[in-house]
């Protein structure tokens, strides 16, 4: 049996695609019994638990102790739950650092045989660069905790080769016992049909001008999304090319309001539930992925990149964004934000289809099944 353990991850579009979808895929595609154990905030606990169990019926959802600084104490409820339910997993996969540390202690107590660290980013750098937590004790200890997770796990998944490089330079990790698997698509993105009719219908639903070239930003307004850099890029593009319009699929911010006032009729914004985003992305031409030059971003593998491609969009991307900036140049998947052409061209259906096919070849979970099977072989 395999347990996939999360600590502090709340239900969201990312949770659906990177946790629930993964657990369901692994259970359906291998001979292993796979169980999600998720510690979530007590705030909205019951509705969030229902939301998780609706999509992953056998998930075991537990309330976290209040305040992230008490994360380690959740291990007692986890250990007790394993014993009460009679579970003895051969492998615990820990999503990120804190879950992996709890899994390592479970191994020390004989409650599991092996531990896998599912590394989603450079967590110590992220906490420092973006003040993810505001607690001195956590900030002081996260680097040594991350080192322990990286070095003591039996196997590791990294979302990018750049993340493995970070482990090597920061923690003296010797590469060899890891598998690089990028953030993969939610299964709903595997079934998108592209046609001229569908693209036109998507533009009409959002009220976009059909004759203009559409840039889209889809995602959160978190600090690492680098809103100020995005604004500078958009102002330059909108000034230089009057045939451009911009769609924001996010919460409306002061930046969006300011751009809308400065460029009347060329800025649209909508906040959509995750299951509706793809149908609007299909009507666009270029996805925006602009990030600061921080360690957090240099090792990242944002799933938004794969989602843009799956909807047939080229990507305007910052340099040094994980493994993806080089990939964009190599495979003609868009442009670096620092090396744009004089004028952006409207995407043809042929080009959209080519890019979508690239996404389906590189970012669906099924394509990484041999890697997952090898991981299971190495750890169970």
Would you name each region that the model predicts?
Residues 13, 225, 271-280, 287-307, ...:
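Nucleotide-sugar-dependent
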Residues 1-49, 232-241:
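N-terminal subdomain of nucleotide-sugar transferases
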Residues 24, 78-86, 101, 105-109, ...:
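Membrane-proximal helix-turn-helix segments that form the acceptor-binding/catalytic region
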Residues 7, 63-64, 116-147, 165, ...:
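Acceptor-binding helix/loop patch of EC 2.4 sugar-transfer enzymes
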Residues 250, 254-281, 286:
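Nucleotide-activated donor-binding/catalytic signature segment of Leloir-type glycosyltransferases, i.e.
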């Amino acid at each position: 049996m395999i347990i996939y353990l999360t600590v502090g991850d709340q239900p969201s579009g990312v949770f659906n695609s990177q946790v629930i979808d993964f657990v369901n895929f692994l259970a359906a595609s291998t001979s292993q019994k796979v169980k999600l154990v998720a510690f979530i905030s007590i705030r909205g606990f019951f509705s969030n638990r229902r939301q998780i169990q609706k999509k992953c019926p056998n998930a075991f959802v537990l309330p976290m102790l209040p305040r992230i600084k008490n994360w380690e104490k959740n291990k007692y409820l986890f250990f007790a739950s394993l014993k009460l339910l009679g579970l003895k997993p051969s492998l615990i996969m820990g999503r990120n650092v804190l879950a992996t540390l709890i899994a390592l202690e479970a191994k020390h107590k004989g409650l599991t045989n092996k531990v896998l660290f599912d590394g989603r980013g450079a967590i110590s750098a992220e906490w420092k660069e973006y003040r993810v937590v505001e607690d001195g004790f956590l900030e002081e200890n996260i680097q040594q905790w991350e080192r322990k997770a990286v070095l003591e796990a039996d196997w590791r998944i990294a979302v990018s080769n750049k993340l493995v490089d970070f482990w090597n330079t920061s923690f003296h990790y010797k590469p060899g016992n890891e598998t690089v698997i990028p953030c993969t698509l939610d299964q709903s993105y595997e079934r998108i049909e592209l046609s001229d009719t569908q693209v036109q219908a998507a533009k009409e639903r959002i009220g976009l001008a059909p004759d203009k070239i559409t840039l889209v930003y889809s995602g959160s307004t978190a600090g690492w999304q680098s809103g100020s850099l995005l604004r500078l890029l958009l102002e330059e593009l909108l000034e230089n090319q009057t045939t451009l319009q911009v769609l924001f699929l996010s919460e409306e911010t002061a930046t969006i309001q300011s751009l809308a006032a400065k460029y009347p009729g060329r800025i649209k914004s909508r906040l959509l539930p995750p299951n509706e985003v793809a149908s609007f992305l299909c009507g666009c031409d270029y996805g925006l992925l602009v990030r600061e030059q921080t360690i957090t971003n240099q090792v990242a593998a944002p799933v938004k990149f794969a989602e843009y491609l799956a909807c047939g969009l080229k990507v305007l991307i910052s340099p040094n964004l994980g493994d993806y900036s080089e990939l964009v140049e190599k495979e003609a998947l868009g442009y670096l934000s620092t090396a744009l052409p004089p004028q952006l061209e409207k995407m043809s259906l042929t080009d959209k289809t080519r890019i979508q096919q690239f996404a389906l070849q590189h970012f669906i979970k099924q394509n990484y099944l041999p890697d997952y099977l090898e991981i299971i072989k190495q750890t169970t």
